[in-house]
Amino acid sequence: MKITNVSKVLSGPNPHHVDARKMYESPHAVAVVITLQPGESLKKHITPVDVFFYVLEGSGIVEIGDEKEIVGKDMLVESPAKVPHRWTNETSGVFRVLVVKVPKPAEETRLL
């Protein structure tokens, strides 16, 4: 058994310049916890594989393709491969999301 504590994982460099902590990586999947402080957002990007997002804390805006919704804690959002998406925190609180890419991408995410 392996247990990973998110507070012990260092935030890795990323093109969005936000707190992103890789919690799990295997040939089959990648899981990252992203924390957006008030006013922060991800750049719109395309992921080469399907992604699902689970909101851990707070609320924020998710954009996938032409759709835009406000989501909050304990909501799961599905995002198909190769569809532009991004997250935005327009609240005064922290917004944390678990990002799971399945399978692990063989190519890099592309910023738009």
Where are these predicted regions, by residue range?
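Short acidic-glycine-tyrosine-enriched beta hairpin
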Residues: 67-81
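Short, conserved beta-strand element in jelly-roll/cupin
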Residues: 35-37, 47-62, 100
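Short beta-strand His + acidic residue motifs that chelate non-heme Fe in jelly-roll/DSBH
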Residues: 42-44, 62-63, 79, 85-91
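Structural motif
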Residues: 30, 59-61, 68, 84, ...
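Ligand-binding loop in jelly-roll beta-barrel domains
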Residues: 81-106
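A short, N-terminal "cap"/entry segment at the start of jelly-roll beta-barrel domains
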Residues: 1-28, 77-78, 111-112
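Conserved short histidine dyad/triad with adjacent acidic residue
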Residues: 32-47, 81
